[in-house]
């Protein structure tokens, strides 16, 4: 299956053939250079390189993103965080129909997957009132450049911006007490977790997977710094490992967040925890 995906992508990029050409043109001879390129990609795949890095893109939610080894590969389980954010945006609009602006902060944005998926859905739903402003933050300059490129490709540069920062360090001061939702899929894997040396994780940026401490360092930083930026009643939602839910809720309560809860994914695993700044 991976070999067909790689060939289909090459046909599309090099010959402008649709992927259906794998069937409709299966008797046609291919240029030798393309065959050599395909074999080289196959060899990399056999050595474990993720397909998303080989083809340079990955579908996520309702969008397709350009990806590279500088960023994590967007995963289906992270779509839960997007869906919960969209649900909360709708809740806020229903509770306050006169609200003119909703601000969302995406910490550790990587390729921009979460911010752009949210922005795309809200734009598709013609949410012109209230105005939606989304700011994606990442420490990696390479990730920020890629996220900006994805925003441009998706036509979302008016609504979704990206900036380099270590968590809250370089966030504009005018955002204090004005953010409605802070969302994040931070590095949460324990540095000794054997999964880091298995599968796709071997090829992904280690700093985007683990805090190199205990798996909670980045989560603590996000939660300890969220209150100055959230408005009254604003929410923070964080993806985490399914065995971390109890600890994340404890950290949320320790930082004076209320209405704390964890939400299961389709497999029943608690993968996202949410808390609200008291109003």
Spans of model-derived segments:
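Conserved SAM/SAH cofactor-binding pocket of Class I
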Residues: 80-195
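Residue-level signal for inorganic ion chemistry
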Residues: 6, 10, 48, 78, ...
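Conserved Class I SAM-dependent methyltransferase catalytic core
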Residues: 213-276
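Conserved AdoMet
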Residues: 9-88
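Mobile active-site "lid"/loop adjacent to the S-adenosyl-L-methionine
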Residues: 186-218
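Conserved beta-strand segments of alpha/beta enzyme cores
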Residues: 64, 133, 159-161, 258-261
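Active-site beta-alpha loop architecture of Rossmann-like, nucleotide-cofactor-dependent enzymes
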Residues: 52, 189, 243
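Helix N-cap/coil-helix junction residues
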Residues: 16-17, 156, 257
